[in-house]
Amino acid sequence: KLLSYLAPRNTAEQIRELTKVFDGNRERVAIEIAKIVCAESYLYGKIEDCPTCEGTGEVGNNDKWKKECYDCNGSGTEIGFNDEIGKVNYQDTLDKFNEAVKKGNLWTPDTESQKLSEAAVYHGICAGLAVLTEGILVAPLEGVVSARFLKNGNGKHTLSVSYAGPIRSAGGTGQALSVLIADIIRRDFGLEFPLMSYDEIERYKEEVGMYRGLQYRPSNPQ
């Protein structure tokens, strides 16, 4: 999926240029690429019906079996791009996006603007992770499942990123930095810091304690 998102852009050229700008600092390059790809998808993207499932979110034989459409993760929609994608200088794209951020209201709940924003954030996270993994594509292609805007316990929206098993191939640094990238991007969309419930924290502590294969085992207070 990531390859199809990046195909119409100049991401490879941007990576080479930014590698020189940041003197080979991969982490800085990854964060900047994530911001660029997110901005491009938001500014030049448009929500369309997924052709694979014809907008239903499901594929299969109507009478015998159905399953969630892989191409759209069951949403029934996908993101397409207008003719500007790949033609506008990345710095101009960032400037245009930053102006939109300053004005606010990048998205409205339960509208196509939310779907577009979620897709843009997802693209940014995957692209940034791809830079960090140095070509080990299974992590950014299959390891990050989705990015969604969900409500905190206080009723305000936050960013939720879902991961799957292939994320393990990114390595610990790549996994951790993908969360950092997500935290940086979510601020542009006015999303609050996630508020973890007591039950979620306790479950995390239990699961970490049960998983003995960790290189570093944090204590419960940590």
Residue locations for each model-derived region?
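A broadly conserved sequence feature marking short terminus-proximal activation segments
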Residues: 50-53, 69
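Extended, Lys/Arg-rich, non-catalytic nucleic-acid recognition/anchoring regions
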Residues: 1-49, 62, 79-222
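Periodic glycine anchor positions in long extracellular repeat architectures
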Residues: 53-58, 74-77
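Cysteine-rich micro-motifs
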Residues: 65-76
